[in-house]
Amino acid sequence: METLTFQFPAAEPGRGRTLVGCVSSGDLEVLMEPGTAGSLNIQVVTSVNGSGARWEQLFQRLFQGRTWPAVNIDIHDFGATPGVVRLRLEQGFEEIAHD
C-alpha cells in the first residue's frame, strides 16, 4: 500500500459531500468534502506501489487550465485504470455541484 498526496489551486470551497464508486466495483472509491478556499487537496491510498508518476500525470491533465472548487478528495484505489479515475472524479464534481 502506498499513500500519495497532491495539491492544486482552486476557487471557493465546494458545497456538500459525496461518495462515488466503491473499491469492489471499478476498483476505486472517491470521497469529496468542502476544503479550504484556494486549495484542492488529494490523498490517494493505492495498492499499486510505485504509481505516483501515473497519478501525478492524470491529475495534471485533469486539474490544470480550469478552475475547480476547493475540495478535499480521498481516493481509495485497488488498481483502477486512468479512465475509471477520471469518471469517478467527474461524477463526484457533478454530485457536489447539485448539493
UniProtKB/Swiss-Prot annotation:
This is Malonate decarboxylase acyl carrier protein. GO terms for cellular component: cytoplasm. HAMAP family: Malonate_deCO2ase_dsu (MF_00710). Keywords: Cytoplasm, Phosphoprotein. Its main location: cytoplasm. It comes from the Bacteria. The modification O-(phosphoribosyl dephospho-coenzyme A)serine is found at S25. It holds the Pfam family ACP. It comes from Pseudomonas putida (strain W619). One of its GO terms (molecular function) is acyl carrier activity. It is found in: Cytoplasm. Subunit of malonate decarboxylase, it is an acyl carrier protein to which acetyl and malonyl thioester residues are bound via a 2'-(5''-phosphoribosyl)-3'-dephospho-CoA prosthetic group and turn over during the catalytic mechanism.
